[in-house]
Regions:
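Short, low-complexity N-terminal intrinsically disordered segments enriched in polar/charged residues
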Residues: 1-37, 110, 143
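Hydrophobic/aromatic beta-strand elements that line small-molecule binding cavities or substrate pockets
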Residues: 81-87, 101-103, 118-124, 137
Length: 143
């Protein structure tokens, strides 16, 4: 059996490569159909009472359209991601990855969208493959 931590690390790296390569299909393949993605209004809003759902529950067509639009209108300046922790459930059927993200997008007009902070990515092993079921929005921790 392959080490679950190594498998999760591979999924995180696959997601990073998908952003780097603007590969919508690979991004979409990572998500479980029940994926939800709560997002804090700012990277400093640690209290989940303020969080919102920008994209709602996973919808392949809708989420794909959002990312195709992003890729068509923005250049990727940099995409730095560092895995800080991977934890696997005792039964090996669930996991989380704590990832520090620093991704900068820029439009041709110079407008920037900076994704910076720490994420908790939650995965379940479904039919032998790891799929993301939840991902917190990026939070700054002053580290």
């Amino acid at each position: 059996m392959t080490d679950a931590r190594s498998e999760i690390e591979e999924v995180v790296h696959r997601e990073t490569r998908a952003w780097d390569e603007r590969d919508v299909e690979t991004l979409l393949s990572i998500f479980h159909p029940d994926m939800v993605w709560p997002w804090p209004p700012t990277p400093h809003d640690h209290d989940p009472m303020t969080w919102v759902f920008v994209m709602g529950r996973f919808d392949r067509e809708r989420w794909g359209a959002v990312w195709r639009e992003l890729f068509a209108t923005h250049d990727l300046v940099h995409n730095h991601r560092t895995i800080r922790r991977i934890e696997v459930t005792p039964d090996g059927d669930g996991a989380l990855a704590i990832v520090d993200v620093d991704t900068l997008w820029r439009t041709p007009a110079g407008m920037e969208s900076h994704w910076k902070g720490r994420a908790c990515k939650v995965y379940a092993k479904v039919d032998g493959a790891w799929q993301m079921t939840m991902h917190t929005g990026l939070l700054e921790y002053g580290l």
